[in-house]
Regions:
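His/Asp/Glu-enriched short active-site or ligand-binding loop at hydrolase and phosphoryl-transfer sites
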Residues: 63, 69-102, 138-145
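Glycine-enriched alpha-helix->loop->beta-strand junction motifs that scaffold or abut catalytic
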Residues: 18-23, 72-81, 107
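Active-site beta->alpha N-cap acidic-glycine motif
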Residues: 1-47, 53-55, 140
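C-terminal domain-boundary segment and adjacent tail
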Residues: 6-8, 121-145
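Short histidine/acidic/glycine/proline-rich micro-motifs that form metal-
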Residues: 3-6, 29-32, 63, 84-87, ...
Length: 145
């Protein structure tokens, strides 16, 4: 989760945690590692950690420079994704997002959905249908350790 969102919406954060979900650090301001100095990037991750207290980290945009990865891997299990749903795209509808999942998912996939206003309508449509379809196909869901 983005630290700034946790800071702004602590009740929603608690609800997610109490629902049994694992929370991962996603920086405080959704910084792109590629365009950020290592010091600034690490400082931003640390700022988010003040609210999150997680040993999991997922780099925004799935991009991280090697030195940032090296430094963060000392403290975090770094989680990358292999299927981005593009739920944030104004050019896609919920049906398109669901079709992307059906087309590209494979065993072991980590699927990325977003919790932003931009993605809300697609998320609301595609997430429950994706879960239902994935279970029908024999997939299961696991929590990161």
């Amino acid at each position: 989760m983005v630290g700034d969102n946790v800071h702004k919406f602590p009740d929603e954060y608690r609800m997610v945690v109490e629902g049994g979900h694992r929370i991962g650090n996603h920086t405080f301001n959704h910084l792109q590692g590629l365009f950020t100095s290592t010091k600034r990037y690490i400082d931003n991750v640390d700022r988010a950690d003040a609210f999150l207290h997680s040993n999991l980290f997922r780099p925004p945009h799935g991009i991280i420079r090697s030195h940032q990865y090296y430094e963060l891997s000392k403290r975090y299990k770094i989680i990358m994704w292999d299927l981005v749903t593009r739920d944030y795209s104004f050019r896609l509808y919920g049906e398109d997002v669901l079709a992307n999942i059906k087309r590209y998912v494979r065993n072991g996939s980590i699927i990325t959905f977003h919790d932003s206003l931009r993605s809300y309508s697609n998320l609301k449509y595609a997430l429950p249908r994706s879960i239902e379809w994935l279970l029908e196909q024999g997939y299961s869901f696991k929590v990161f350790e």
